[in-house]
């Protein structure tokens, strides 16, 4: 008699930072029957249904204070917990994995109420409020950065790194860039994560002319909400909302200018790309600054608060680095040293240990 496959529910929603690691994990569990838990009208509705059945619940975060809107949210939360509990019970799931965010709460509560194991992956150096609250409820919290452990004293945790998309696993096999960039020229790649970064885009456009004069090409991934798109034209300036083959692009880059979301940093590290980091100032609890600190302490990046960064300062920092190839090379080596390229494998092993014990 053939054993039925283990059923696993993955609760991951919102941005690429939550979704890409979860998808990378799922691909390492081909013998599992996996379903997804997400939120309507979020990125997962575009990425997940091609590979896994997607179940959705309505859930959102609480604002400060306890007003009518918070009571409405509380009502939705209770309804979501009951819906997830019913899904887990009727589907005979044997475990839950979550990558955090608002969706983690209903998933963890529902799973633990049924006695199911929960693996929580936290990619940030400063764990989010949801992780800090629900971490002790979980079987184990898998960490992207080991410095996060000090914020989770009551949770069982292990550092496995943050899984990257499959294109980053075989870097030598990446196809050539289909961009009009000659060989041997410095390339600056600018990106703001899966949502773009309007403020960074504005600084870059003001600073870029001096970089062109220095012979550099700029590949600027603006996101799809940039109001100033097409405002800068230059033969050495390539402007795109997104670019699919990020692994090849970051390998070609001499330098990246980026936000410091955990997913972006993980990809920079795997590719050994030196970076100038501009933490998103409105991130919850300023957690992107904690992520950036890991890289600056390791000598893999420079970091600047957005409020203190001018176009002139950014312009000069980039020019100084371009004029010092040995420094860029050392930063790239330091970034590589942070990377955990087999993170998805390590997380998959952890999931198997917890779910199958």
Swiss-Prot record:
Reaction(s) the record says it catalyses: di-trans,octa-cis-undecaprenyl diphospho-N-acetyl-alpha-D-muramoyl-L-alanyl-D-glutamyl-meso-2,6-diaminopimeloyl-D-alanyl-D-alanine + UDP-N-acetyl-alpha-D-glucosamine = di-trans,octa-cis-undecaprenyl diphospho-[N-acetyl-alpha-D-glucosaminyl-(1->4)]-N-acetyl-alpha-D-muramoyl-L-alanyl-D-glutamyl-meso-2,6-diaminopimeloyl-D-alanyl-D-alanine + UDP + H(+)
Keyword Cell cycle applies: yes
Single Gene Ontology BP annotation: lipid glycosylation
UniProt-recorded Gene Ontology molecular function terms: UDP-N-acetyl-D-glucosamine:N-acetylmuramoyl-L-alanyl-D-glutamyl-meso-2,6-diaminopimelyl-D-alanyl-D-alanine-diphosphoundecaprenol 4-beta-N-acetylglucosaminlytransferase activity; undecaprenyldiphospho-muramoylpentapeptide beta-N-acetylglucosaminyltransferase activity
Listed pathway(s): Cell wall biogenesis; peptidoglycan biosynthesis
Pfam families: Glyco_tran_28_C, Glyco_transf_28
Residues binding UDP-N-acetyl-alpha-D-glucosamine: 15-17, 124, 165, 194, 288
Subcellular location: Cell inner membrane
Top-level enzyme category: transferase
Residue ranges the record marks as coiled coil: none
GO CC terms of this entry: plasma membrane
Protein topology in the membrane: Peripheral membrane protein
EC nos: 2.4.1.227
This protein's record includes keyword Cell inner membrane: yes
Coarse class of the protein's main subcellular location: membrane
Keywords: Cell cycle, Cell division, Cell inner membrane, Cell membrane, Cell shape, Cell wall biogenesis/degradation, Glycosyltransferase, Membrane, Peptidoglycan synthesis, Transferase
NCBIfam families, per database record: murG
Function text: Cell wall formation. Catalyzes the transfer of a GlcNAc subunit on undecaprenyl-pyrophosphoryl-MurNAc-pentapeptide (lipid intermediate I) to form undecaprenyl-pyrophosphoryl-MurNAc-(pentapeptide)GlcNAc (lipid intermediate II).
Entry similarity comment: Belongs to the glycosyltransferase 28 family. MurG subfamily.
Protein name, per record: UDP-N-acetylglucosamine--N-acetylmuramyl-(pentapeptide) pyrophosphoryl-undecaprenol N-acetylglucosamine transferase
Top-level taxonomy: Bacteria, Bacillati, Cyanobacteriota, Cyanophyceae, Nostocales
């Amino acid at each position: 008699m053939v054993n039925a496959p283990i059923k696993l529910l993955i609760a991951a929603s919102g941005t690429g930072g939550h979704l890409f690691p979860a998808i990378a994990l799922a691909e390492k569990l081909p013998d599992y029957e996996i379903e997804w838990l997400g939120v309507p009208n979020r990125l997962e509705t575009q990425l997940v249904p091609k590979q896994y059945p997607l179940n959705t619940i309505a859930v959102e975060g609480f604002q400060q204070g306890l007003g009518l809107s918070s009571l409405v949210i509380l009502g939705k939360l209770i309804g979501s917990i009951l819906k997830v509990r019913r899904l887990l019970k009727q589907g005979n799931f044997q475990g839950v994995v979550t990558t955090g965010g608002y969706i983690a709460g209903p998933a963890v509560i529902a799973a633990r109420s049924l006695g199911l194991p929960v693996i929580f992956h936290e990619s940030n150096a400063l764990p989010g409020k949801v992780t800090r609250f629900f971490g002790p409820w979980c079987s184990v919290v898998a960490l992207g950065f080991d410095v996060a452990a000090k914020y989770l004293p009551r949770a069982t945790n292990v550092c496995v790194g943050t899984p990257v998309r499959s294109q980053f696993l075989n870097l030598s096999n990446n196809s050539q860039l289909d961009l009009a960039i000659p060989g041997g020229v410095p390339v600056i790649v600018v990106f703001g994560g899966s949502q773009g970064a309007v403020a960074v885009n504005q600084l870059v456009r003001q600073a870029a002319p001096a970089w062109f004069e220095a012979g550099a090409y700029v590949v600027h991934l603006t996101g799809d909400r940039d109001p100033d798109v097409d405002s800068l034209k230059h033969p050495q300036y390539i402007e795109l909302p997104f670019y699919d083959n990020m692994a090849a692009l970051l390998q070609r880059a001499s330098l990246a200018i980026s936000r410091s979301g955990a997913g972006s940093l993980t990809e920079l590290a795997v590719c050994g790309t030196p970076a100038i980091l501009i933490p998103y100032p409105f991130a919850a609890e300023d957690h992107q600054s904690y992520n950036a600190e890991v890289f600056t302490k390791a000598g893999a990046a420079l970091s600047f608060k957005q409020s203190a960064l001018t176009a002139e300062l950014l312009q000069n920092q980039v020019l100084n680095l371009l004029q010092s190839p040995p420094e860029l090379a050392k930063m790239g080596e330091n970034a590589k040293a942070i990377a955990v390229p087999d993170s998805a494998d390590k997380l998959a092993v952890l999931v198997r240990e917890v779910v199958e014990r």
